[in-house]
Structures are given as C-alpha cells and as structure tokens.
Amino acid sequence: MKGLIIIGSAQVNSHTSALARYLTEHFKTHDIEAEIFDLAEKPLNQLDFSGTTPSIDEIKQNMKDLKEKAMAADFLILGTPNYHGSYSGILKNALDHLNMDYFKMKPVGLIGNSGGIVSSEPLSHLRVIVRSLLGIAVPTQIATHDSDFAKNEDGSYYLNDSEFQLRARLFVDQIVSFVNNSPYEHLK
C-alpha cells in the first residue's frame, strides 16, 4: 500500500510540510510508504518564493510525476497553509490537473496549518473539492497552528504539540482502515 501527500505551500520547509513528514513516520509503523510531493520543491506554476522560475520542461516533468504518483497511490492527503481563509492557489492549480480518475473512491486525508487565526475552513473547502472528484474525505482532519511546532537545529520544523501528535496517529490509523476495508473497490 502506498500514499501520496501533496503539499500546497509556496514556502520550502513549511509547517504544513513538517506535519506531512510527521505523518510519513506514522505510516511507516503500518509498513506503508507515504511519499510527499511538495509543490514548493516541485512547482507547477509561477508563484515561487525562492526567486527562481522553473523552465517549462521542468514544470511539465513535475506535472507528469504528480499524475503518475497520484494514479498509483492507494490514498491521497492534501496539505495546505491557510491562505486568506481557504486553501492555497498552488494546491488549486495542482488539483486542476488531476481529474476524477486520480481520486475516484480513494480515501483522502486533509491537513492544514495557520500562521495567524487558527481555522479549519481551508479543509472544509477541500472536503467539497474531494467530494466533487469522487474521493472519500476521511472524517478526521488536522488543522494546526504555527505554535504547535518547534524548530530543529537545522531550522526545519517538527510537530511539538502532544495533542496533535495523538490526532496525527488517529488520522493515519483512520486512513489505513479506510484503505484496508474499502467497500468501494469495485467502483474504482
């Protein structure tokens, strides 16, 4: 079993990507590979905080990689920062390239992080998108705040809040359960 976590932040080493890294460790306890596709590192559009714009060929290759990984995944996780009360345009751009074939009857987890006001609104918006793509948004979602993280010596973030660590384990267990017990396999 394998999954794909798509991170829709323009910032490299974002809080959302730190949460995704934390989740991948918990999937490993179930012998599940969950790969991260970080749109800050593999951009599909022109918004780029690093100051470099990738070539058209690089963008096309990134899109090809995303589509192949999404199609092969048994589940997907969509991760976003809270941008103006919703999910990021970067994630929206990526989702515009993935049709129902990539989501149909697959469990989809939703994770997000807010730097300002804590809000799960971006995840509520994504829940509607997942439904329209025929995916199955799992009930447990994770909406963190910057204060739920601490910094490693190298400057990268890690999830430091014990309540969210517990919620992350529940989230992973729920996705694994949905994949292992899917009554929808015949509908794919």
Curated annotation (Swiss-Prot):
InterPro entries xrefs: Flavoprotein-like_sf, FMN_Rdtase-like_dom, NAD(P)H-dep_reductase
Temperature dependence: Optimum temperature is 35-40 degrees Celsius. Inactive above 60 degrees Celsius. Thermostable up to 55 degrees Celsius.
MF terms (GO), sorted A to Z: FMN binding; oxidoreductase activity
Keyword NADP: yes
GO cellular component terms given for this protein: cytosol
Position of the signal peptide: none
Cofactor: FMN
Swiss-Prot/TrEMBL catalytic activity: N,N-dimethyl-1,4-phenylenediamine + anthranilate + 2 NAD(+) = 2-(4-dimethylaminophenyl)diazenylbenzoate + 2 NADH + 2 H(+)
Keyword terms of this UniProt record: Flavoprotein, FMN, NADP, Oxidoreductase
Protein name: FMN-dependent NADPH-azoreductase
